[in-house]
From Swiss-Prot:
This is Probable cytosolic iron-sulfur protein assembly protein CIAO1 homolog. Belongs to the WD repeat CIA1 family. Essential component of the cytosolic iron-sulfur (Fe/S) protein assembly machinery. Required for the maturation of extramitochondrial Fe/S proteins. PANTHER family: CYTOSOLIC IRON-SULFUR PROTEIN ASSEMBLY PROTEIN CIAO1-RELATED, WD40 PROTEIN CIAO1. WD repeats lie at residues 3-42, 48-87, 92-131, 137-176, 181-220, 239-278, 290-327. Gene3D superfamilies: YVTN repeat-like/Quinoprotein amine dehydrogenase. Transmembrane segments: none annotated. GO terms for cellular component: cytosolic [4Fe-4S] assembly targeting complex. It holds the Pfam family WD40. It comes from the Eukaryota. Signal peptide: none annotated.
Amino acid sequence: MTGHEDRVWSVAWSPNGFVLASCGGDKTIRIWGKEGDKWICKTILEDGHQRTIRSLGWSPCGTFLASASFDATTCIWDQKSGEFECNATLEGHENEVKSVDWSVSGSLLATCGRDKSVWIWEVQEDDEYECASVIHSHTQDVKKVVWHPTKEILASCSYDDTIKLYKEDEDDWSCCDTLEGHESTVWSISFDGSGDRIVSCSDDKTVRIWKSYPPGNQEGVVVSGKHTKWKCVCVLSGYHDRTIYDVHWSKVSGLIATASGDDCIRIFKEDTNSDRNQPSFQLVATQRKAHSMDVNSICWHPKDENILATCSDDGTVKLWRFTPAEE
C-alpha cells in the first residue's frame, strides 16, 4: 500500500480491525479500509502536525485516534461526525513525542518522548485532557509506552537500556519496577493477552520475555514489598542480524512478531509444553526482504490471528497473511 511520501513510522489497527492507520515523515496519517478484496486509502489526515508523526494509538472504543509527533505535540482525532477531526492538541513535552497509548478503560492516555519523560493524561468530559502526572524515571530518550491489557499499569522502554513499570499509588503515579538485562536501547515492548508477560526487543539484537511474580507467588520467587516483581525468563538471540525496532505479541494467537533493521519480519511461537517460568520459543517464519529498507513497525490484527501489518523506511505499508505449518 503506497501513498506516503516519506518513511512510514507506525501502523495501528482499529480495535475492530476494520481500519488500519499509518503515519510517517510526510506529517500525514493515512486511514486504510477494505473495498472488496483491496485495501485502499480512505482518508488522509493533514494539518495536525508540523513535523514527522512517529506513533499512533486508537482508543478502546475506536472513536478516537491519538498521534504523537516530533513537533512535541500529541493530537487527538475523533470521527464522531463521520469524518476525522483534530479536537485536542496535548502540549507539554519539550521536544519529540515518540509514542502514545490508551489505557484499557479509555480514561487514561500515556505519552513519552526524547525529553526522558512519561506523561499520563486523564480524559475529561467534553474532550478535555488533563495532565495527571509527569514521570522522570528514565535517564534517556523514552521510545515507547504501552498499557497493561486489563489493569491501569503502564510500561515504558528507553535508550537507557531499561524497561520501567508504573502504577498509581495514593493519587500519584510512580515507577514500581525497573527491568534490566538488555545491553542497548530497548526499542519496543508488548504485553501478552493476560498481561502477566512482556516481550521486549532491542538494539542488542535480542528479544526478551519477562514474567510477573506478585507477592506470595506460587513459584516461590522472593518479592520484597507490595509491588509485583518482573523477571527475565527467556532470551531469544542469534535470530536477527540488526536492530529489532518493533515487537508485537498477538492477543489472539499468542504468536510474537518482530520487525528489524535487516529488512525482515519474523514470527516466534511458544512451544506447546513450555514452562511459563522458563519458556521456550521457536522461530516459525522469516520473511526476508519484507521491505526494501528498515521495518519500523509491526502489528497483529486484533481479530484475525493470521493477518499482520508492517511499515518501513521504504515508504510502504504492507499486509501479510501468515499460514501456520500443520502440527
